[in-house]
Curated annotation (Swiss-Prot):
Stated name of the protein: Serine/threonine-protein phosphatase 2A 65 kDa regulatory subunit A beta isoform
GO MF, one annotated term: protein phosphatase regulator activity
Native organism taxonomy: Eukaryota, Metazoa, Chordata, Craniata, Vertebrata
Positions annotated as HEAT repeat: 20-58, 59-96, 97-135, 136-173, 174-212, 213-251, 252-290, 291-333, 334-372, 373-411, 412-450, 451-489, 490-528, 529-567, 568-601
Function: The PR65 subunit of protein phosphatase 2A serves as a scaffolding molecule to coordinate the assembly of the catalytic subunit and a variable regulatory B subunit.
Keywords of this entry: Acetylation, Repeat
UniProt gene name: Ppp2r1b
Sites bearing N-acetylalanine, chain numbering: A2
Transmembrane stretches, start-end: none
Subunit-level organization: PP2A consists of a common heterodimeric core enzyme, composed of a 36 kDa catalytic subunit (subunit C) and a 65 kDa constant regulatory subunit (PR65 or subunit A), that associates with a variety of regulatory subunits. Proteins that associate with the core dimer include three families of regulatory subunits B (the R2/B/PR55/B55, R3/B''/PR72/PR130/PR59 and R5/B'/B56 families), the 48 kDa variable regulatory subunit, viral proteins, and cell signaling molecules. Interacts with IPO9. Interacts with SGO1. Interacts with RAF1.
InterPro entries reported for this sequence: ARM-like, ARM-type_fold, HEAT, HEAT_type_2, PP2A/SF3B1-like_HEAT, PP2A_Regulatory_Subunit_A
Highest taxon above the source species: Eukaryota
UniProt record similarity statement: Belongs to the phosphatase 2A regulatory subunit A family.
GO BP terms in the entry: apoptotic process involved in morphogenesis; meiotic sister chromatid cohesion, centromeric; positive regulation of extrinsic apoptotic signaling pathway in absence of ligand; spindle assembly
Amino acid sequence: MAGAAGPGTVPGAAGGDGDDSLYPIAVLIDELRNEDVQLRLNSIKKLSTIALALGVERTRTELLPFLTDTIYDEDEVLLALAEQLGNFTGLVGGPDFAHCLLPPLESLATVEETVVRDKAVESLRQISQEHTPVALEAHFVPLVKRLASGDWFTSRTSACGLFSVCYPRASNAVKAEIRQHFRSLCSDDTPMVRRAAASKLGEFAKVLELDSVKTEIVPLFTNLASDEQDSVRLLAVEACVSIAQLLSQDDLEALVMPTLRQAAEDKSWRVRYMVADKFSELQKAVGPKIALSDLIPAFQSLLRDCEAEVRAAAAHKVRELCENLPTEGRETVIMNQILPYIKELVSDTNQHVKSALASVIMGLSTVLGKENTIEHLLPLFLAQLKDECPEVRLNIISNLDCVNEVIGIRQLSQSLLPAIVELAEDAKWRVRLAIIEYMPLLAGQLGVEFFDEKLNSLCMAWLVDHVYAIREAATNNLMKLVQKFGTEWAQNTIVPKVLVMANDPNYLHRMTTLFCINALSEACGKEITTKQMLPIVLKMAGDQVANVRFNVAKSLQKIGPILDTNALQGEVKPVLQKLGQDEDMDVKYFAQEAISVLALA
């Protein structure tokens, strides 16, 4: 395989003298054309190794032409190739030769598979930065023009992602050409191309001169926002955020707001959804004055939209919208123009809408302050705590800390309790799991007395749940509670209840005792572990069930480091030695492992 390889021929790695040190490279090169996809993929991923071995000149003259001609491979291989080439500038001789990487990437930017094209565009964008301004106009801009005027829509969609990276460093004449190409793609016959152009409109606007934004980008935005395809119109809404940031208030009001108002009332729910989804960014981009005059009315209609998806997206933005309002007059705007709509959503027919609102409504308490929260928000929180949908109740409980800062949790505690109990016993185990995870937070806010009186029994009940994930989470929960309430509380309240389970007829519950001891020993410290927990663990070493016995060995290994030498040598060692002779293989294995780890051999 020595000598120069023409396009389509695999470049040879080993020279005529049969240098053995290059043999692995020869293998990698052979694998580039192997029938096995996995081998080709493996070789492509090591392309930089091949290039290093060949040197910069042979990489340019042999490897790259070969790669350019093999663009008919499996998508997975092409994706890897597109990614590799983005980091190849140093391997072809540096920025002066970066243009050598353009032909294979240009081919990759036209293939059918979207992920490959996107990766090729990403690599081209990377390489564009490594071109000098002269090389950019000589090599990169012509590539963009070729893609932009290609016969296949695939090449034209790829071009859309390249305009913004080459525009800033181009000469004025070339800039005009680039803008012209972008304009024509915005009105392309193929919806996929118009979609690609719309998705890059905001990015392109940011690198243009202000005059061009007004005279060219805004008309393109207006056209795309009234495109016959809703998938194009919704992308224009996204671009509006970037465009709005570039214009003065007067220009915004005259040039952009009529189109945005129209989008908020679009006949397609997907476009209205996009307006709702981008609402906070739009609010910041247009500024407080226009937000009050134009966006608040639009937001009101989105909160009452006939489509639940749109109402849910708008509900998600309620807190951010209120926080972003200017502090002067904010309370009045929220109370008069937003709160009446929120009250309606609390009893919405759709649970996703109610759930979305429940995830943010608590945050309004910090914006509205103590009096308004007690008078206006508290009734809404209480209504949501009684909602038939568990996700709604859960979202309220998981955001309690917001309210606690403003009014204290006692106001809610009477209604909280039934909601917590219901969730704790919900038929869906994932709901039970979620409430367990909030228990340490709740405990900290409600205080130890309230917790002991109302919630302690729940936490103990979870330890014997029929789902293992719940029992496991309940064990971790106990450890966090001990860290919050201290060892004395653990000794008096938790440890006795846990240890009683060691005599439970169900072996799974007996094992839970061991898991709890593992979790609690560190938090409870040496004295409680030695005096209260260790005797129970040692007693359980004689359990009839092998699973319990090997968990005894694991528990002794876990709590061993906390115990003093006397307890280890006098009590733990004999029990582990006995378990080390057990008839069950697993028990024997874990006992011997514990002896080894605790250095008791």
